[in-house]
């Protein structure tokens, strides 16, 4: 939907693009599908994501030139590379610019979908995390949250690592029930894992839980604004600043009156004013003057939570507060955090052949990110153990729900980057709901992401191409000559064109 229609004809004629769309979106099952595609088909499906990989370089640059402020319009950034290399690579651009880092590193367990060796000894695991934790700190703003998911195997070591690596921070450890049926163990059946929420000490950094979401088990707290407790605490004289009228008109709250004088006593809970306005006072059902639970100078801060409610039996109006936002508890036990129901099942609907067996619940990650961003609708989130792209999916869902502008950065080194990580993002942008790998609807959103591949030192060595004459090969039969030859000649001469060749940087884009 961000592409100028002048490019539509070329897109419709591109066979590689059409084939990818069939694989991703099953467009061949749409009524208006044809081969080749038509411009009208593209106009009717504006959220199909084009991949510039399939187009000539000149065409790609011409397209990008039509998009103003491309960086500002990019919603995500994905790297297919070793994550430490990515952390170092993005420092020039993103140093002190990230709001949140969320990672779900290998747990050092016997089974895991993550590519890294999964039976690290504790010291090796600590080294793996410490290097990346230390390097990534430079990317964070002064106000930040760093969230690390972990289980019981390395939880203690992670806590010690955090204490030794970061200073002046708070490390709040949340327990999340991700496996309600329990995992087999010798003594206990583990049902939970942990999330370390790390943020600067002495500040308000964690957002509130929104219980207005019907998918949550915890519901909003709905009760009268009037203090309904018993005893002296609910009476007017216990807090004079909490006795004042609230004005309603046509069933809506329109104004808050001033605190009443001590010698003023209304006749009833409701008094009619001018122009159809009704004054509502905090008077209990027995006629005793009570009080609102908020003083006059603070009640306007909860205006959005208040409503006027008419009781037809009593023929009177009262003020009701619907509180939907609460501090997150340190135990997350909602069924929505089940990794099976909302992790594996969700991913299998999108990608039935995914090799990932235990992805995080989409709600676990989205709630962590929302809490970590302090409920902000914008911010940059970095995940350098991206796996199946649950983090990107969560960011996209959050933006879809509130029209936010959160941005994700992912790093994933696995070969499944092209078969799972990137395609999952392409799919969930096009449709929110999926079944058997096919979209249920076309409720897509406008989206753009960039993906890059970084070659590591190991990649360069793997790509060495050696040329050796028969005479050179004979020299290698002499063990003394062989060692000197390998050290002084092979790397310098034979593999010269395979290693990083600085002469080729005269034409960097042709390297």
Show which residues each predicted segment covers:
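Small/polar loops that bind or transfer phosphate-bearing groups
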Residues: 79, 149-150, 383, 412
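Short acidic/His/Gly/Ser-rich catalytic and metal-binding motifs that mark active-site loops
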Residues: 107-114, 339-344, 462
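Conserved proline-anchored active-site loop of SAM-dependent methyltransferases
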Residues: 96-111, 381-395
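Short amphipathic alpha-helices and their capping/turn segments at secondary-structure boundaries
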Residues: 83-100
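Conserved SAM-binding loop and adjacent beta-strand
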Residues: 350-363
